């Protein structure tokens, strides 16, 4: 282990148009093969589609969707005495946001549809309303944590 000290936590930058960190986090997660300009195009088209669908501020829809999908608790596999237990752990806000973004993008990639911008906008609108695959994934994780509450002392 290094004796030089701890690395400071990186802060995410905000995107150029909306000046929003959440949008930039989405861009960085949707990015494939280093094509960041394409990732920005996809996100901005999705935001425009949200604006057209809901006729409200698209960033508030995005925030509401993130709030709905972000988990409070997660399960982690822990090996104890030859058997593996799913141990429920509380997670911080940063890790929760990262999980929520991953689930939203995964759910939107699985959706049938024309292009990624359309699928992402549909998933975000559904998540803001309280439905969709990403919300289902969060509820499933919470159910798993509740079912394995007996193993909480294995942390």
UniProtKB/Swiss-Prot annotation:
It is found in: Plastid, Chloroplast. This is Small ribosomal subunit protein uS7cz/uS7cy. Belongs to the universal ribosomal protein uS7 family. One of its GO terms (biological process) is translation. NCBIfam families: rpsG_bact. One of the primary rRNA binding proteins, it binds directly to 16S rRNA where it nucleates assembly of the head domain of the 30S subunit. Part of the 30S ribosomal subunit. It comes from Chloranthus spicatus. Its main location: plastid. GO terms for molecular function: rRNA binding; structural constituent of ribosome.
